[in-house]
Amino acid sequence: MSALNSLPLPVVRLLAFFHEELSERRPGRVPQTMQLWVGCLLVILISMTFEIPFVALSLAVLFYGIQSNAFYTTFVAILFVVATVLEIGSLFLIYKWSYGEPLIRLIIAGPILMGCMFLMRTHRLGLVFFAVAIVAIYGQTFPAMLDYPEAVVRLTLWCIVVGLYPTLLMTLIGVLWFPSRAITQMHQALNDRLDDAISHLTDSLAPLPETRIEREALALQKLNVFCLADDANWRTQSAWWQSCVATVTYIYSTLNRYDPTSFADSQAIIEFRQKLASEINNLQHSITEGQCWQSDWRISESEAMAARECNLENICQTLLQLGQMDPNTPPTPAAKPPSMVADAFTNPDYMRYAVKTLLACLICYTFYSGVDWEGIHTCMLTCVIVANPNVGSSYQKMVLRFGGAFCGAILALLFTLLVMPWLDNIVELLFVLAPIFLLGAWIATSSERSSYIGTQMVVTFALATLENVFGPVYDLVEIRDRALGIIIGTVVSAVIYTFVWPESEARTLPQKLAGALGMLSKVMRIPRQQEVTALRTYLHIRIGLHAAFNACEEMCQRVVLERQLDSEERALLIERSQTVIRQGRDILHAWDATWNSAQALDNALQPDRAGQFADALEKYAAGVATALSHSPQITLEETPASQAILPTLLKQEQHVCQLFARLPDWTAPALTPATEQAQGATQ
């Protein structure tokens, strides 16, 4: 701890970030890492034995292709086969008509690259077109490196082998031999979330970060999609299982903030918590067995009173409704998403994005051809790889690519100087490469925030030490050239994406916040009664809120990187946005607490009280996008009916009023914390 205290704050934050990423718990991560690790070693063995060129490309296919579950790996493998056919076909067409004319070759390759980048952003199968774009631009370097058309044709044909045999290998490893099924990962993930919930129910623990809660909720939704596609039993009983996922998410996120020490430990409350934990354990056992859980628990009056006293009645009712749900309930038909985005041909940003990528590639091609420096051809690949829809995400990808390339270059340098002279055979080479590939595979299976570092590190290392050589190599020039090529491509891309049609998310962020607040207002309009339809609707919209707040949080992180904006305006926007996100999460949890006490309200009185909050929030959200929102002020009218209900509800709703009053005023020239007391609220 003393060593960390002596380090600069940015370094401490960076170390904390990597510690969080490297220690991430995710079902299927260990099998995916082992599949990737074994696949890399087999690629090296096969490529060295049969002298197959482009080892780095084969490794890249593995890193992009091996996914967290067998179904996803199969899907990506099919896409890779289609992409290989398209990309090799496009290369042969380019060579046939323009092999000896670089200008004509670029004129033909340019529209292909633009079309691929356009479709990458607008089509559901964007990964296919991304692969075609990579090979289309990488193939332009072959004629410059070789003077013989026959040799270029052979290299291009080798690309088919290089792309397809790792695809076959990852299918054998990840699908046939050692499959990791999505249904198994879902069962493990649900049980892990329930374990965390029980821990917070029985012990006083510090709450987990909200961002982690939201990411876990989104991970469950992604696994649900894979289970629907991969498991027939899950599809048959999908209505029950989707309700199970929503219920587990609600229990996990709600109990994360629960503190059992804040309530009196009467014997009735202690027994009720034990009974609730026992029911959750029964649910876990059924999930482990892959069975739909059915419960015969009926809450007695004393248990209901204890649940209300310790603020667990809504969780209890939600759990019991799941236990009493018919497993054979017919699922709601899912709408098939369109293959193209709705504004694909009306939004000019998509075509501008393609033009910017082409411009960056042409600048790099002109530079490396003009200086006759073939070793830095990775600059063109960099321009395509770091091309992202907006400035912030492009900068994030540039940092990841540069960081991975730097680590890979350092490892390649140390490997060439210290290890390579002592190697005599392929077995020794594999033993030395094993820890490097294992580290890269573990990083590559982390979250999207850092996974590309592992991929880039291994690919850069292979480019510098294993590319097209089938024996010991001591040439340090390769390491220098590959690293400089990546740096040049990153710099050119940064300049292009910053000054040529920059796509800033600064204007989109308030609209995103308004959408999240609008969804929160819909939650408030749902009747606060223990009715099946209302509860299910509430749970599903609540999951959407987790996704909305997480998307806003990630967008804030990207806007921070947009240095083309005025620093003061950017800082003000980020501070206001983070305040809205933080208060929105608090409002959601505070509104959850009102459900337990709102049962005593008359059904006719409920919409009026909830409507006050929903109307105020909708009015505030409508003004966020135009920077015309003031902090909402709500007056709670104390009618005889409201005075007759539990005083706990009034206190809870007054707390919601306080949270409303702390929402930032978007009309103020500078953000100041709200100090005005909300009407109807007490401190």
Question: What positions do the PLM features span?
Answer:
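Juxtamembrane/interface segments at transmembrane-helix termini
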Residues: 125-128, 175-188, 447-451, 477, ...
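Pore- and pathway-forming membrane helices of multi-pass small-molecule/ion transporters and channels
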Residues: 9-18, 33-74, 81-89, 106-173, ...
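Long, hydrophobic alpha-helical segments that serve as membrane-spanning/inserting helices
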Residues: 1-34, 41, 49, 151, ...
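Membrane-entry segments of alpha-helical transmembrane domains in multi-pass membrane proteins
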Residues: 27-31, 46-51, 74-82, 97-104, ...
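C-terminal functional regions that serve as terminal interaction/effector modules
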Residues: 418-419, 423-430, 434-438, 446-474, ...
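A cross-kingdom feature marking solvent-exposed beta-strand/loop segments within repeated
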Residues: 74-78, 96-101, 147-150, 154, ...
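Alpha-helical transmembrane segments of multi-pass membrane proteins
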Residues: 61-62, 354-366, 376-387, 402-414, ...
